[in-house]
């Protein structure tokens, strides 16, 4: 195949049918139940296969369902993009924490000064904002570095976990700390519900209660142990999420942060860690009056990941810089690209598909179609803005301006989240209707395209075990169809989302950059 711009198909398109998975169980399967003559015909006429979108295939823990952010990041990167949860877990498994100077420097400084180490975070196995395994791994790191006094300030979950499930985590943490340092030298020194410690709506009165119990050892409640404090909270009618700030005082005196102490915030998700972090590190902080603000060891409070670019605190696991994503590669080759979606998925075909880049690349155009504003939930309008999007997309194809087009149809996912089976069927049918027009335009232009999804959703609308509506994503594979006029074209099986960027470049007769470790899935018989 000659590598010339004149001979390649134009445009090459990636059509992402969000939330459109393949489930062999046909019951409460909106994808199966919908009338989809276009998809049915495409599968008959063109090469097709299934793709993995979950767990290790997209940089998540095994078995973890994919999501739109992760899916589009992998689609655009052309390599598995390890998510923060997985990156940190892998660093622990590979014994790499000890070689991370952002973690070791403040601990070493505190040890040298004879000061304490404080660990802050959501003590939970939920895996959404944090994981207790990460917290206990850093405690073990502190022990290896010679720390004598380590205090854990535990935020309680009850939201990504059962409402009253914190006891097991507290008992496990105290047992491990006692094993590492001795029970008198290390323990859970405060507990507070995430409602207070992890606010994200500038409710500073809540954050202040968490800050004061961590820094000053002053809470509205006092207990001799974390477990006793939790029992008292339950007796007050509080669940884990709402546990009042409780100072734990096994020896009668509170734990207070002091100058020279080390402090590490061990949540990995940013949005609910920002406010408390700002209270620790910002000189001009105005959320509430800080009665105490100790000068912490080394460069101050450590963030496990970057909670915000403007927070002046060291980051143990900074954002990965994705070089030569599909969008960047196409731009470097002097080609034109279109990203198009309705509001609900606009960030996914732009920011996430570009590897976390806000700005357009050279030669990139973005088309935003507003999602419906006249309904509370999209099951009231399952077609959403698919027809308006299709009008714009077909016009763009007919204009012949673009070499690469990336489009997302949001319906299967957004209506799937409603749990409304009948509406999800209508959503899938609307997408199929639109898909027919788009494929006709691509064929008319002499182009090629891949039709796929970022993850499943609408193919399982009722949970098979509980019988309740299922509103979450699934771990089912998703279809991949290669629409091409080439005779004898094939698609390899057992692919993942990261394989599509190198595949698209190959369709465009463009070389694949070495950073893209995904496989090219197209071939010939």
Swiss-Prot record:
Transmembrane segments: none annotated. It comes from the Bacteria. Its EC number is 5.4.2.12. InterPro entries: Alkaline_phosphatase_core_sf, BPG-indep_PGM_N, Metalloenzyme, PGAM_B_sf, Pgm_bpd_ind. It catalyses: (2R)-2-phosphoglycerate = (2R)-3-phosphoglycerate. Pfam families: iPGM_N (PF06415), Metalloenzyme (PF01676). The active site is at residue 68. Substrate binds at residues 129, 159-160, 194, 200, 269-272, 345. GO terms for cellular component: cytosol. Monomer. Catalyzes the interconversion of 2-phosphoglycerate and 3-phosphoglycerate. This is 2,3-bisphosphoglycerate-independent phosphoglycerate mutase. The lineage of its organism: Bacteria, Pseudomonadati, Pseudomonadota, Gammaproteobacteria, Oceanospirillales.
């Amino acid at each position: 195949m000659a590598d010339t711009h004149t001979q390649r198909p134009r445009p090459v398109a990636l059509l992402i049918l969000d939330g459109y998975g393949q489930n062999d169980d046909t019951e409460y399967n909106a994808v199966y139940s919908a009338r989809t003559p276009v998809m049915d015909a495409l599968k008959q006429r063109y090469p097709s296969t299934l793709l993995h979108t979950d767990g290790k295939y997209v940089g998540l823990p095994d078995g973890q369902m994919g999501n739109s952010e992760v899916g589009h990041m992998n689609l655009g990167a052309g390599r598995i993009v390890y998510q923060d949860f997985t990156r940190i877990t892998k660093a622990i498994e590979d014994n790499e924490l000890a070689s991370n100077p952002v973690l070791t420097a403040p601990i070493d400084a505190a040890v040298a000064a004879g000061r304490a180490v404080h660990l802050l975070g959501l003590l939970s196995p939920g895996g959404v904002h944090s994981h207790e395994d990460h917290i206990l791994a850093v405690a073990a790191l502190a022990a290896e570095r010679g720390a004598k006094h380590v205090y854990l300030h535990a935020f309680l979950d009850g939201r990504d976990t059962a409402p009253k499930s914190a006891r097991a985590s507290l008992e496990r943490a105290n047992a491990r700390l006692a094993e590492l340092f001795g029970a008198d030298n290390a323990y859970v020194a405060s507990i507070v519900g995430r409602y207070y410690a992890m606010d994200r709506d500038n409710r500073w009165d809540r954050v202040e209660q968490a800050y004061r119990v961590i820094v000053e050892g002053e809470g509205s409640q006092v207990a001799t142990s974390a477990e006793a404090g939790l029992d008292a909270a339950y007796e007050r009618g509080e669940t884990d999420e709402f546990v009042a700030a409780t100072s734990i005082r096994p020896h009668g005196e509170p734990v207070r942060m002091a100058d020279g102490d080390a402090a590490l915030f061990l949540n990995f998700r940013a949005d609910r860690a920002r406010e408390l972090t700002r209270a620790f590190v910002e000189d001009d902080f105005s959320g509430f009056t800080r009665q105490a603000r100790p000068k912490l060891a080394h460069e101050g409070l450590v963030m496990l990941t970057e909670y915000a670019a403007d927070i002046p605190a060291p980051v143990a696991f900074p954002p990965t810089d994705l070089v030569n994503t599909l969008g960047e590669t196409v731009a470097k080759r002097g080609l034109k690209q279109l990203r198009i979606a309705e509001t609900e998925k606009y960030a996914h075909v732009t920011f996430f598909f570009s590897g976390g880049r806000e700005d357009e690349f050279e030669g990139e155009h973005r088309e935003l179609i507003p999602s419906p504003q006249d309904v509370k939930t999209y099951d009231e309008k399952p077609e959403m803005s698919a027809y308006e999007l299709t009008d714009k997309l077909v016009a763009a194809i007919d204009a012949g301006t673009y070499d690469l087009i990336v489009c997302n149809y949001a319906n299967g996912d957004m209506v799937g989240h409603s749990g409304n089976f009948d509406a999800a069927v209508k959503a899938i049918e609307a997408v199929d209707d639109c898909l027919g027009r788009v494929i006709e335009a691509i064929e008319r232009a002499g182009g090629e395209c891949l039709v796929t999804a970022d993850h499943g959703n609408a193919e399982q609308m009722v949970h098979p075990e509980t019988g309740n509506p299922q509103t979450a994503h699934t771990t089912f594979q998703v279809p991949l169809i290669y629409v091409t006029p080439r005779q004898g074209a094939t698609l390899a099986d057992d692919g993942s989302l990261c394989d599509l960027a190198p595949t698209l470049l190959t369709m465009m007769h463009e070389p694949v950059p070495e950073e893209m470790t995904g496989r090219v899935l197209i071939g010939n018989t």
